[in-house]
Structures are given as structure tokens and as C-alpha cells.
């Protein structure tokens, strides 16, 4: 009898232990998720335009400045004698798509760094005094990677053409210039909203990150790289006689300006951007391998950037036609790339 009671007691103790460990694991899991949320996810949720906490922050903090990497202020808040705040953009349209705007849902850095701009790291005693006196704290500033001179050069070079210019520091990936046209004046975005956001207007569209265009001859870099990958020991022996065009299976590719480049190796074909030679190379390499190479080079993938962007598109297989293969390998066909990519 005593043994049965002892076994029953031992069984109950095991049950209690299992329940205790179960709730302990749940508790530890909640703590782990809380820490993960605070370190990784909190800024994203707080920065969401749908988060009403932002309105609370805005009531207590004067939005911080946005500057270029070389110290030029490109967005700031001006407060008049009555306490009315106005967001000012000293350079107007020049930084429009990069900086964005802070109204109507926000865009650009104003949107991506909204939480930072509305968060204040003023000295805590200063914040206490401000709270008592009803004075707003000064928000944190955002220092961008943009270079003022590079941005100005890109803006002036694009002039009145529709298109985009983006300059990236190759060693770090820092964006030093980003221009998209048509553009808008962020200083008057509220008054101009119906015009810039109306049917037929693309002024709000950031072509630098969201535009998709045929890459043209720049794609020959990938065609040449795939040829080198497939023929690492013999690529220097490549030779092609260009007479301004190439015809295969009834389809013809012409060189720019119908120019004849004569006898070329791979280097000369690349240097002269010879369409005929690269169409010929395209028929030599394996389409499936070229497709794999392009996927490795971030085609068909989202670029890791906080700005709204579109993925570059590439698709080519060994079952595709000769015509499509030739077009694709000179940067035409169905291939689309974003200026960011």
C-alpha cells in the first residue's frame, strides 16, 4: 500500500515538473521574442505610417533634420512665432525622390527614417524641462550617404529628360546620388498633390529604384562573363569577323549605325560593344547557365534597400528561340533592369 502511494506521489511530481517546465519554456520564449522584437522589429512597426504612435511623437518632438554626407541640410523644420511648423527643403526638386516628403503618407527618407526623425536624444534633464514648460524636444538628425556635389551634377546632367541617375560607391554600396525625373517640389507637395498624384502623372514615381528598362549593351558584361565561365581556357582564342550584322535562323541583328568592326577577339568585341559578335557569343553559351548566372547577380530578386523598389527581370532557357537568345545577349529581348540594379 505504501509503495503504491509512493509511486502515485512520484507520478504526480513528474506531472508537476512537466507542467512547470512547459510554462517556463513558454515564459522564456516570450522573453526571447520580446528581446527580438525590441532589437529587430520595433523600429519597423513604429515607423509604419499606420501606427498612431507617430502622431503622439510629432506632438512632442520637432522633426529632425536630414543632411547630406558632406553636411548640407536638405530637409529641416522651421517653427514660426506662433509655433506653427513647416517642413522646408532648401534645394527643392533636386533631392525630391531621395528625401521624399513628410505629408500624405510620406515617401523617401522622410518615410524610411520617420521614427528616427521623431525620436529625441536630447539630454534627459533638458527633456524634463521641456515637458514641464510645454516645449517640444528636438528630434534626431539623419545623415544620409548622399553627396551634395554628386547629386547636383546628376540633377543638372539629367536636365529636362525623363529618366533616372543613381551613383553607388562600389566598395560600400552607399548611394551618393539619386535623381529621378519627372519630379516635384517637396516644398509645395500638399498644394500640388492633386496634380502630381493625378492620372497620367509619374512625378511621384522614383524611376531610380522602381523603373524597369531594357539594359542595352551594359548587359554584355553578363554575356561575356558567362562565356568566360564556360571557356576559361580558350576564351582568348575567340574570334569573330563582323560585317555589321549577323543572321541566324532567318533573324538578323545589326551593329549600331550598321558599322562593320572587322575581325575581333573577345576584348575587342566588348570594347566596341559589337552587337553581332555578342549575338554570336549568345548562341555559343548555355542559356540555362546564363540564367543561373543572372539569378546569382540579383536578377529576379528584391534588392536589399528600404526604398520601394522593383526587381530586375531575366528569363532565358535552352528551349528559347534563336532570335530571343540573340536579342537577350545584347541586352534586349525580355530583360528589364532597374537603374538601382
Indicate residue ranges for each PLM-predicted region.
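Periplasmic/cell-envelope proteins involved in peptidoglycan metabolism and beta-lactam response
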Residues: 1-193, 203, 212, 238, ...
Amino acid at each position: 500500500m505504501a509503495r503504491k502511494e509512493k509511486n502515485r506521489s512520484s507520478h504526480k511530481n513528474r506531472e508537476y515538473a512537466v507542467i512547470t517546465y512547459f510554462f517556463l519554456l513558454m515564459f522564456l520564449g516570450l522573453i526571447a521574442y520580446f528581446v527580438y522584437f525590441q532589437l529587430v522589429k520595433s523600429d519597423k512597426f513604429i515607423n509604419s505610417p499606420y501606427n498612431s504612435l507617430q502622431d503622439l511623437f510629432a506632438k512632442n518632438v520637432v522633426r529632425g533634420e536630414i543632411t547630406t554626407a558632406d553636411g548640407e541640410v536638405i530637409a529641416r523644420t522651421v517653427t514660426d512665432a506662433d509655433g506653427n511648423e513647416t517642413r522646408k527643403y532648401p534645394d527643392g526638386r533636386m533631392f525630391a525622390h531621395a528625401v521624399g516628403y513628410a505629408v500624405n503618407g510620406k515617401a523617401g527618407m522622410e518615410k524610411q527614417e520617420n521614427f528616427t526623425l521623431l525620436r529625441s536624444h536630447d539630454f534627459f534633464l533638458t527633456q524634463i524641462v521641456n515637458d514641464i514648460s510645454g516645449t517640444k524636444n528636438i528630434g534626431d538628425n539623419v545623415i544620409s550617404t548622399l553627396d551634395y556635389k554628386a547629386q547636383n551634377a546628376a540633377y543638372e546632367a539629367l536636365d529636362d529628360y525623363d529618366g533616372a541617375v543613381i551613383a553607388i560607391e562600389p566598395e560600400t554600396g552607399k548611394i551618393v546620388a539619386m535623381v529621378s525625373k519627372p519630379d516635384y517640389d517637396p516644398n509645395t507637395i500638399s498644394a500640388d498633390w492633386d496634380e502630381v498624384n493625378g492620372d497620367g502623372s509619374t512625378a511621384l514615381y522614383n524611376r531610380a529604384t522602381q523603373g524597369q528598362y531594357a539594359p542595352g549593351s551594359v548587359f554584355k558584361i553578363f554575356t561575356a562573363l558567362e562565356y568566360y565561365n564556360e571557356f576559361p581556357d580558350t576564351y582568348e582564342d575567340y574570334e569573330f569577323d563582323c560585317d555589321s550584322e549577323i543572321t541566324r535562323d532567318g533573324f538578323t541583328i545589326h551593329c549600331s549605325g550598321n558599322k562593320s568592326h572587322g575581325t575581333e577577339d573577345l576584348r575587342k568585341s566588348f570594347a566596341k560593344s559589337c552587337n553581332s559578335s555578342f549575338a554570336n557569343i549568345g548562341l555559343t553559351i548555355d542559356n540555362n547557365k546564363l540564367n543561373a548566372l543572372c539569378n546569382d547577380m540579383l536578377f529576379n530578386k528584391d534588392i536589399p534597400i528600404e526604398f520601394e523598389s522593383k526587381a530586375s527581370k531575366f528569363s532565358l532557357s535552352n528551349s528559347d528561340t534563336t532570335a530571343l537568345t540573340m536579342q537577350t545577349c545584347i541586352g534586349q529581348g525580355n530583360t528589364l533592369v532597374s537603374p538601382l540594379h
